[in-house]
Structure formats: structure tokens, C-alpha cells
Amino acid sequence: LSSSAASDVYKRQDVPLSMLFGELPLEKKVVQEEKNVFNVEQKIAIDADNDLDISELDPKAKESVKKHIEKSAENVLSHPTVGSKSFLITIGDRSVGGMVARDQFVGKWQVPTSNYAMSLRSFDDVCGEVISIGERPALSIHNAAASMRMAVAEAVTNMMSVPIESISSIRASANWMAACGENIEDLNLRKGVEALSNFCIDLGIAIPVGKDSLSMRTTWEKDQSNFTVKSPMTGIISAMAPVKDVRTSITTEYKNLEDPCLVLVKPNNFFRLNGSIYQDIFETSFTDTPDISSEELLNLFNFIQSGINKKNIHALHDISDGGILTTLSELCFTNKIGCSISLDNNFQVSPEQFLFSEEIGVVIQINESKLKELKQSAHSQNLIFQYLGKIGGSNFDILDKNKDKLFSRDIAELEQAWSQVSYRIKSIRDNKDDAKSEFDLISKTSNTGLFANDSFKQPKKGLKILNLLKNKPKVAILREQGVNGQNEMAAAFIKAGFEAHDIHMQDLLEQKKDLNQFNGLAVCGGFSYG
């Protein structure tokens, strides 16, 4: 429809709500501001004077920092929220949809580190849609409004790897969960909804749909005592945007560059730890909660989109659960190659804050020759642009100001820690020996990942020798109940030069069709036949 025609349709359909639903009773709710008070025992024994420069510490103190970071890294990577979710992915059939342009797995080793999902609109086009999710429920315990802004920001940074016309072309669905009926829970929901509305209005992101579950609490009685468990106010943002060309997207897989390096890009210089996995592991109380403004997110979005469109950014991974240490680790796992990161910068925060804070940001792979140009562009948009280090080797190394190793682990060991929970679940659910074999494959250097091994001779003249374009052999695509993939099969044959025909079993039983009419037969399998 043209804009004028669409406007006429909208006007004709624009009726007052009272015409559809009658006079709705509007209940007035009064909620009072309360201050959350947390009395949690401090269990952190490390204090590096809130400074990344620990080079001046005495050897004993420095060794204590090293041990703490190593322990923290393993605990964070093996946390169920952070760890590999392959047990959820491999149980499903990933081959059904022929228009899936990007699923969870990335690279030749098929590691589940994709930031987004992407689909094609047809078998013959390169345009499609990108989908991502954002959620930060742990933050709402401390700051409900910030949790919703961060959820939107996470959804946006997850789809930043895909060129999108503008941030306003993003549409989202909001899924609300809360334990309403109590003052503080009602207040948090009000704050969350209001913050989300204002934030998305500023960005131009529309939220036309959503759902809610507002009785997220369970109660029980035991030994004459009453117990209650409540869900914190949670908003899950599912975002989607149209994509003109899915081939222009980048992933967590590195490109083969002349002089590659890794760079941190952040919209602000905060490294707050409230609501982080690090806080959860050590049961520690922090005062400041991560947050972001609409202007900061828009600046980051525009910078990354420009860098991808100009082919200056070649790989990207966002910072989310687990912090930048997890982001860098997952890049290492995806590419089976290590990195050497330097903490020599001016952030004035402790190593723990830098490595485990879950503030919004991204790590990008660029050519070192583009450092100056991109840094100037980032600074012009009020962004933090920090060189991190080089790619290479088989270890993940973190160096201090004097280039001494603050942290050094083999990436295969780290990936096994990251995959531990998924492996344990597979061992219970699936064949135990198969799960163990898959887990052990992580540490095998002989594992080359996916590769094509053509064991047949291809004709020198290709498919032209078959003269398919002129004669177009007819192939019957047979289907029945429970069949899936017949459309994809037909599309593949058509692409190869065949003439595909849709044949149902009922057509054969009723003798409406005869297989003698066709030059070939393709039978697609289905779930109904086990």
C-alpha cells in the first residue's frame, strides 16, 4: 500500500476502545517508594587498590590476585548462565528450515556463540530478518528501570553484527514477569514499564506486542512455617529487524587478516558489578548497578554499523553475562586460537571490575592499520575505544603493565570448563559414552572441524554436460504426514536445473499421478515414522 492508502485504512479502522470492550473499569493503584537494603557478608579477599596497574604490588599480593582471577574465570565460565548451551541445541533438528541464514553455531568447529538468529525471506533472495534477545533480570533486584534499559541494549548489541537500515527499524516484543500484589513488586513493574517506554521512544524502537505473567510467586508451608519464593521483575526483549543482504553480516568467527587485533568499544567508562555473575558466585554486595542512556546506545550502534558497512570491522562479540573475560574466551573457543590481552590502560578500576563487569560494550576484530581511523571516529561519538591485544597461540593470556602474566590458561581447558554443565546434562540425558567422546574432542588438536571431502570425480564441464537448462528433467518430491523439508528439497532441485513437482502419497493412491511421468524421485523423511 502507498502511504496515503495505508493512512485511509488506518483511519477507517481507528475506533474508540469503548466500542470494542465497553467501559473498562480503571482501577487506581498507589505504590510507595521503598529502598532495597541488602545485608550480604562480603567474601571478596582481593583489593587491588581499584587500579588495573598491579605491577607495583609485592610478589605475594600479586600472586593472590592471579589466583583469585584464575578461580573467578573458571567459576564464571562454568556458571549455567554463561556456559555452553549446546545440550539445548543439538537435541533439535537444525536442518529443517532451508531459509535459516544463521543459527546458534558458528565456524568450522560449530561452537554456540552466535549473537543473533537470521532468516531469509525466500530461497531466491538475500534479504531477510535478524532476531535477537535481551534480558537482565538480576539487575532488577537493585534497579528495575536499569534492568529494562540494559535488556533493550543487550538485544540491540546482539544484532549489531548485522547491517540494519537504522535503529528505528527494529521492532520488539516485551515479555513481562513479576510477582504483583505487593507494594515493592508493583512499584518495580511500574518503574520497568515506564523506563522501557521512555527508552524505546528515544531510540525510535516500537514494541507492538508482548505478554505478561504477573503472579510469579510460589508459597508453601513446612513445619508450621510459611515460605515464599518470588521472581524479580523481569522483562525479556525479543527484537527483530529487516536485513537487506544477509551476506554482509559478521559473526564471532575471525577473518583472515594481515595484522588482526582486538579492540574494546564501550559507550561509557563504567565497570559496575551489581547483578553480575561474579557477584552471584562470591555472594558479594556492590553499590552500583550497570545502566545505559539512549544516547550512549545510539552512538555505539551507529559506530558499529558504519564500521561493518565500510568493511573495517570483521568479527564482533558483545559483552553480556560473565563480562569481557567471557566475551574474549568465547571468541577463542569459536576460532580455536588464543589471544594476548594487556591491562595497560587508564580505566582506574580493579582487574576484577574490568574482566567481570557486564556493562554494555563489544569486542571487535579489526586490522591494526585501521586503529587510528576507527579510534578518531569512536571518540567523535563519545565512545571508549581501547586496544586490547593480539590474536594468536593456544593460550588466553592477560598481561599487566609490565607485560607480566596476570592470567594464562590453555583455551581448550577453558572451553572444557565452559562446556562442563552442558556435558553433564548430555551425559544424563543422552548416551554417556557419546557425550564423553564429544567433550574430549575439545582438547584434541587433531580436530579440524567441518570440512568437505569430495570422493567422487566432478565433470570438467560441470552440470552443463547434463544439459539440464534445456531439457529440465522432472523430479517428483514425495511427501506424506509428518514430512518436513519438502520445500527445501524442491528448491535445491530447481536451483540445480530440474523441474520439481509436489506429489502427495494420496495422489499415488488415487492414481492421480504416475511416477512413470518423472525422471527422478526424492522422498523426504519425517518425524511420524520414528
Question: Model segments located where?
Answer:
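A common structural junction motif
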Residues: 377-387, 495-499
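Helix N-cap motif at beta-to-alpha junctions
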Residues: 363-372
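Glycine-rich phosphate/pyrophosphate-binding loop regions near the starts of catalytic domains
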Residues: 20, 39, 74-268, 276-286, ...
